[in-house]
């Protein structure tokens, strides 16, 4: 089956927003008007086509980015729905990697909100061309002009209106198109399907002229010929103006701002026109780079005749099809039934079922081309961020970077059956979401879930209970402490048990001292003259190792310690490996006491990004958490604060930071090193655990 749409006619874009700005409703309307969705799904009734997981339908928030294909004016739109909640920013970043452009939805009443700032910064990081849609213009308090000012003040970006609203709040009727200098109004009866051009209302003529002038002046700056003509009094025609707005979007010279009310079905068709007119096709953005087997840089052009290269950006477990891997094809042609290589993992895969997804209905296809976003069923090895490519022309596309999880909880299945289901379920969840990790605590044997935030883990637990029917108890978050000796100690210990028959006898003499940080446990025997026979040395080591997992301060693992066996004694009949194991264990515990063991706590490297107004509060709060500020710098119009903070003082921080900054500050943290805990902290931990 040959290609139906030229790659220049593709628009791979996402819809980004703060939670509740109307992103899912906007997507729903796009699907409705492009003829893909026959009944409009309302989020507040929990029926939106894009929000298809049970948890999303209940909470009214979008969690997974579903990819949907639709058509408008002869162009093929691949829409990637992205989540808008801060705990899911990993999903947003992942979507941004495979998008060519984005529509940023603002709540016309709220303007630029905290999460808008976060997704905007992520858009800057990946250099995603954007247009802005001021939604909810029918809401009480909606103010289009405040939205424009917010973009300048809070995002440090240059907005240019290409539409103005007609009517305010409940009287919102339509918009002024500043490119064509026409009014457009919608008929309420036809669910927004019918709209017509009108002359610009008299009360808006002056304002329309003022904003048209701003638009033209910003646009002509981008082309010397048009600028010269403009200075000679020649206005650019509609086609030229559109070409220049497109250029502005592609180079981020300015951001076109549109308006409407998706819920009231007004302004969606012109938004679709703007997606087609101004957002890039795959050939308008820089070609993707990768590396070959030898680490040399390779560029893959968006062309069907180039070697095949695709990136897996999302993995989902589908109850009917099994594992589905969403991929973006950057170059070449993908054909069902052929073999490819997963170059990230050096494994072969066979392409089985290929699907085009529409929220949660699917269409089987046999071929897909550069620029397509497809869902592949049944891949065995693929994980998020992996590259699949032609085995003869291998390439690894740039890897996605995922932040380390910052919060962990223990989970205990209630029954044996739950235990078995839990293992399978966690493996699937970890494959779907790289920011969610699972590990086993060797000390307690508990299964530990690690994630990006409290909501993130709540939803994982919810999925375990509903989708996989696992019943489990969830523990409170916990910190992993360690112990270490601080000074050299020498011990001489004799284990003697002689009560008729074969007794037990072993004597050991150790020097125990701190090792270099990160060196771990080291054992050396310097015994001479056979004081401890060679066959008993493994018993000595076994005794020492049994103490390492549970120290003398509060029962946490002992790290960075060196033990030297310098002398000992044995008995021809009563000595054994077991006797030396018991003697070594007791001697080591005594040496840990003598060597003044201390408690170590994990110190996290914390980065807070906050608007300047809140810098003082954020620093004060970090200091109160025993944090040490390492430095500050500016990123755009935000302040970046770097600090070292003990992990035990960081629980609940995300909620504190949100309330302290009205939700506008964000933070990341990762483990940096272990440090000695102050006496009061050590005493508190000993009281709890020892």
From Swiss-Prot:
* GO-annotated biological processes: ribosome disassembly
Whether Protein biosynthesis counts among this entry's keywords is: yes
Q: Taking every annotated instance into account, which residue ranges of this chain make up the domain tr-type G?
A: 8-283
Which keywords describe this protein according to UniProt? Answer: Cytoplasm, Elongation factor, GTP-binding, Nucleotide-binding, Protein biosynthesis
Matching SMART domains, A to Z? EFG_C, EFG_IV
Compartments annotated for it: namely: Cytoplasm
Extract the PROSITE patterns matched here.
G_TR_1 (PS00301), G_TR_2 (PS51722)
Entry's family note: Belongs to the TRAFAC class translation factor GTPase superfamily. Classic translation factor GTPase family. EF-G/EF-2 subfamily.
Q: Which PANTHER family match?
A: RIBOSOME-RELEASING FACTOR 2, MITOCHONDRIAL (PTHR43261:SF1), TRANSLATION ELONGATION FACTOR G-RELATED (PTHR43261)
The entry's protein name is Elongation factor G
Q: Which organism is it from?
A: Rhodopseudomonas palustris (strain BisB18)
Lineage, highest ranks first: Bacteria, Pseudomonadati, Pseudomonadota, Alphaproteobacteria, Hyphomicrobiales
Q: Which gene encodes it?
A: fusA
